[in-house]
Design a protein with these regions (language model features):
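Catalytic, metal-anchored helix/loop core of enzyme active sites in primary metabolism
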Residues: 1-381
């Protein structure tokens, strides 16, 4: 029996993770959970699964949940990291949203844990730091949960990076794939939240609409699989059945297909290299009709181009890009700026980002994150 710590238990990835654990309760125990502020949802999970440890990122929610459950509830970043380091924990599922997921990932690695990673911001902000931590803690390892990175992980199956010609990361294209760029000025929050394929949280749905999410995935792929940026491509695939592809140097092109159901990559991340039964929809190839693929429009989806640029510049630029984007998406969701302001202001922050030479440290990453948030907030006041 493996004890699972689920960070981000009430989001879309967290909910799917709970279902996978429920389907394999003979193998996994939901030992600890963390969430931001959803007291009722967490209380329900704790009671149903007899969860032993709990953390709420919001201190007020932690106090409320403590009264509700009559048990100690940890709070804040300190609480998240305490769960990530728990001696009884075997697997840490990091399904937290945004930069808040970075420190718990690093803590888990430092304590030799298996990290099932859905928090792409960890790798975007601190990829070189993660490389160092994994080298220092050989017992620890990461399995990716994002469907695209899970697909690449499965296609590679441990093959050395020298055999890879390029990675091809698929993108649905989001709700604005067929919109003319002239209409982008009028995009509303409701328009951007109307994703054609996936049901996700608001922040990642906006990132998908701007294709920043795909840009973050490019950086994550670079750091997860040690593949140079010039060997990573993005292809728009509206049906979202092919989750990503690997072109090998011998001419073989390997793809991973599956229904757009996050429970599949979650289970792969938890059980690899074993494949266990899972109650989910199967693809029926004759009914698929056709699968289509297009080049992305980097002019229309400027965020994707900016992410490639951030990756190539390296240093603290990816962390600053990510932080600026988080602030801007939040402002857009609150109706305080236009959709087209997101790439415009991200570019402004990136332009002013200093070049960092030498070894990137965690302190530099966290300082860059704070500075970019301060600058972006001032920019949109």
């Amino acid at each position: 029996m493996k004890n699972v710590v689920l960070l981000g238990a009430t989001g879309s990835i967290g909910t799917s993770s709970v279902d996978v654990i429920l389907q394999h309760s003979d193998i996994f125990k939901l030992y600890a959970v963390a969430a931001n502020s959803s007291v009722a949802k967490v209380a329900e999970i704790v009671r149903k699964f007899k969860v032993e440890r709990v953390c709420m990122f919001d201190p007020n929610a932690a106090k409320e949940l403590e009264k509700e459950l009559g048990m100690k509830v940890l709070a804040g970043m300190e609480g998240l990291c305490e769960l990530a380091a728990d001696p009884k924990a075997d697997i840490i599922i990091n399904a937290l949203m945004g930069a808040v997921g970075c420190l718990p990932t690093i803590t888990a690695i430092e304590h030799g844990k298996h990290v099932a990673l859905a928090n792409k911001e960890t790798m975007v902000m601190a990829g070189p730091v993660i490389w160092d931590k994994l080298a220092e803690n050989p017992k620890s390892f990461i399995t990716p949960i994002d469907s695209e990175h899970s697909a690449i992980f499965q296609c590679l199956s441990g093959r050395p990076e020298k055999e890879v010609e390029f990675l091809e990361i698929t993108a649905s294209g989001g709700p604005f794939r067929e919109w003319p760029i002239e209409k982008f000025e009028s995009i509303t929050v409701a328009d951007a939240l109307n994703h054609p394929v996936w049901s996700m949280g608001k922040k990642i749905t906006i990132d998908s609409a701007s294709m920043m999410n795909k840009g973050l995935e490019v950086l994550e792929a670079h750091f997860l699989f040690h593949i140079p940026y010039e060997q990573i491509k993005v292809v728009v695939h509206p049906q979202s059945m092919v989750h990503s592809l690997v072109q090998f140097r011998d001419g073989s092109l390997m793809a991973q297909l599956g229904a757009p159901d996050m429970r599949i990559p979650i289970q792969v991340a938890l059980t690899w290299p074993d494949r266990l039964p899972l109650e989910t929809k199967r693809l029926d190839l004759p009914t698929l009709a056709k699968l289509t693929f297009f080049e992305p429009d980097f002019n229309k989806f400027r965020c994707l181009a900016l992410a490639f640029e951030a990756g190539r510049r390296g240093g603290i630029v990816p962390a600053m890009m990510n932080a600026a984007n988080e602030v801007l998406v939040d402002a857009f969701l609150k109706g305080n700026l236009k959709f087209t302001d997101i790439p415009k202001h991200v570019e402004t922050i990136m332009t002013g980002a200093p070049t960092v030479t030498g070894h990137l440290t965690l302190d530099q990453v966290l300082e860059a994150d704070d500075e970019a948030r301060r600058l972006t907030s001032a920019l949109i006041k």
